[in-house]
Amino acid sequence: MKNPNIIQPEDLRISQIIDANLDRAREGLRVLEDWARFGLGNEDFVIRIKNFRQILGKNHLEIYKLSRNHIEDQCKGLSHVEQINRNSSSKIISSNSARVQEALRVIEEFSRIHNSKLSKIASEIRYEIYTLEIEILNFNTRKRAQSIISKNNLYSITDPRENLLEIIEKILLGGVKIIQHRFKEGNDKDHLKEAIEINKLCKKYNSLFIVNNRLDIALASKADGVHLGQDDLDIKTVRKLLGASKIIGVSANNSTDINKAVKDGCDYIGVGPVFPTLTKKNKEPLGEEKIKALTKELNIPCFAIGGINKLNISSLKNHGISKVAIVSGLLNSEDPKDEAMIIIKELSHEN
């Protein structure tokens, strides 16, 4: 039975336009759906995108499909240089989201007179995609950062010194992929200026830049995330202010604080101190056995911290600890690049 609300367009070209753009929208949605499924493992995104695809498929009527004439389409196969430059998952997400949004806008306009139902559907889905694109991009960015943290065993933490940028670049050249900026002296202007410069270096070497404690500096310097102590703002508050795309690390030294941090949604945990250290003078070292006991059941990355250097890496490895955060053990080295390379190799070595 024919739907009385759907009128066959008198101009065949209108049906062709709608058909082509329904194809575009559905194809773009399929790209987004497959990345949400295989790249991000996000069931919520998959369900939402699949629903949009099914709705458009149901409304891809025969009157539109029968108008298709690829043989006489003089513009088929045209491409643009920007299509070649989609060299990251974020660019693929953005370009295919735009493809869907633009196609839906065309459908909305050209179906308004003869198929008001389709026009309304296109409008509603288009606005949903505007929001979904940002959600996917944020999740994708955070997923990348989480992957770097998961795959890399050495985490470098800074302390104030005159030639810090030079040292950090050497550490990055040594293969370190995570840098945390800890700034306990000076004023906020100097702190921010230094943070911005370190972030530039990290981006140059495709590494993560984390700011210790200071949410405001993390936001202003466009850091990849922030690392919190037990006396800092809580994770849920920081997440609201920081946004969904950034990562949050937490320092903890007991099971209660560790379990709470995991429950509240942190991305990784720093546990320590393992050994005596000048950066945590007032804290009793936990020792290797305690660190292992605290972290063995966790399903997020955990970095042991405190008094760690290349001389005790082997002992940590013997206790099943393979992810470490190091401060002076790298910064005070005569050759930070070689030191980083040696430690990374030692951490990756199977016992």
Swiss-Prot record:
UniProt-listed InterPro entries: Aldolase_TIM, ThiamineP_synth_sf, ThiamineP_synth_TenI, ThiD2, TMP_synthase, TMP_synthase_cyanobac_bac
CDD domains, alphabetized: TMP_TenI (cd00564)
Binding site for 2-[(2R,5Z)-2-carboxy-4-methylthiazol-5(2H)-ylidene]ethyl phosphate: 277-279, 307, 327-328
Region annotation Unknown: where it falls in the sequence: 1-128
EC identifiers of the protein: 2.5.1.3
Binding site for Mg(2+): 213, 232
Functional description taken from the UniProt entry: Condenses 4-methyl-5-(beta-hydroxyethyl)thiazole monophosphate (THZ-P) and 2-methyl-4-amino-5-hydroxymethyl pyrimidine pyrophosphate (HMP-PP) to form thiamine monophosphate (TMP).
Name recorded for this polypeptide: Thiamine-phosphate synthase
Species whose genome carries this gene: Prochlorococcus marinus subsp. pastoris (strain CCMP1986 / NIES-2087 / MED4)
Phylogenetic lineage: Bacteria, Bacillati, Cyanobacteriota, Cyanophyceae, Synechococcales
Gene: thiE
